[in-house]
UniProtKB/Swiss-Prot annotation:
Keywords: Acyltransferase, Biotin biosynthesis, Pyridoxal phosphate, Transferase. Its cofactor is pyridoxal 5'-phosphate. This is 8-amino-7-oxononanoate synthase. Catalyzes the decarboxylative condensation of pimeloyl-[acyl-carrier protein] and L-alanine to produce 8-amino-7-oxononanoate (AON), [acyl-carrier protein], and carbon dioxide. Pyridoxal 5'-phosphate binds at residues 77-78, 150, 175-178, 204-207. Its EC number is 2.3.1.47. One of its GO terms (biological process) is biotin biosynthetic process. It catalyses: 6-carboxyhexanoyl-[ACP] + L-alanine + H(+) = (8S)-8-amino-7-oxononanoate + holo-[ACP] + CO2. The keyword Acyltransferase applies. Belongs to the class-II pyridoxal-phosphate-dependent aminotransferase family. BioF subfamily. Homodimer. Pathway: Cofactor biosynthesis; biotin biosynthesis.
Amino acid sequence: MHILRGGRRLISFSCNDYLNLTHHPAVKSAAIAAINLYGAGSGASRLVTGNHPLLVELEERLARIKGTQAACVFGSGYLANTGIVPTLTGAKDLILIDELAHACLFAGTQLSPAKTMVFRHNDVAHAEAILAASRAQYRHALLLTDGVFSMDGDRAPLATLSALCAAHDAWLMSDDAHGLGVIGGGRGSVAAAGDPPVPLQMGTLSKAIGGYGGYLCASAAVIDLMKTRARTVIYSTGLPPASAGAALAALEIIENEPELTAKPLAKARAFCAALGLPEAQSPIVPVIVGAPEAALDASRQLADTGFLVTAIRPPTVPAGTARLRFAFTAGHADEDVARVAQAVRDIVKL
């Protein structure tokens, strides 16, 4: 949370280490122990010799937490999405994707020969209209969404999307990079939505988990397909033992410390209440400024006050919606949350 930048000590409100597990003693010890036992790297693709026991254990743990039959670990979240989407879809298929879905989901669609259609953000009626008009023309349909949207912090209506996909014989895939560990009792966005059927649950090990890597939790058949067909699995070196060991330790903490997993959202909601903003749905809170220059200026003024808050500008976000993106963690002191809220009130016209 505390960083040095330009000789100044700042409190960061821009880091996705929501549970502050990157520096947790148990997580660091597990990474070191994994290196001592298995070495610094995996040495090869998982289909050759890179499938060390910690990866198998990690996949079993992820599947249990997500309530699926199996899981496949990838080298990163980006590698996961750019491997999963083209593996599941072909030229005779249809992909629907939320307009604000993460860039790596869009990258996955670009690697697939399937027809891709974009629906308005969280607009289930628009997605339904597309499926009603087009579904019959295609063999399979895949609907892609974030569980928690990384720039707006809002959640996808997963229960409604699940029912929609069931009605139109479509597969639903949710990217839970910003949900696991911080909502749904730590289990993520599907759990927070009441555990509707979401057959494809993807995520990352680099946010609340505090390490590095990506994963897909799904049926045993889908996971077998990924491990034998996904190019980002077959042609990538397996995740290093240290990353797998650290992730296992982090998941142990998440499963056994519910009070810790509840803190980031509580901090975000306290911030929103102080500023009169709508109640936060996740630890991510955007303060929309508008012009890129105004966002940069506000970020600089916050730094002068002792806070690191990154200005997010187009093309990362739509034109006219440049913003300060706040990410709240379990370790943020209540008084610092109150102070940064006051600083925003003084700097930004809300």
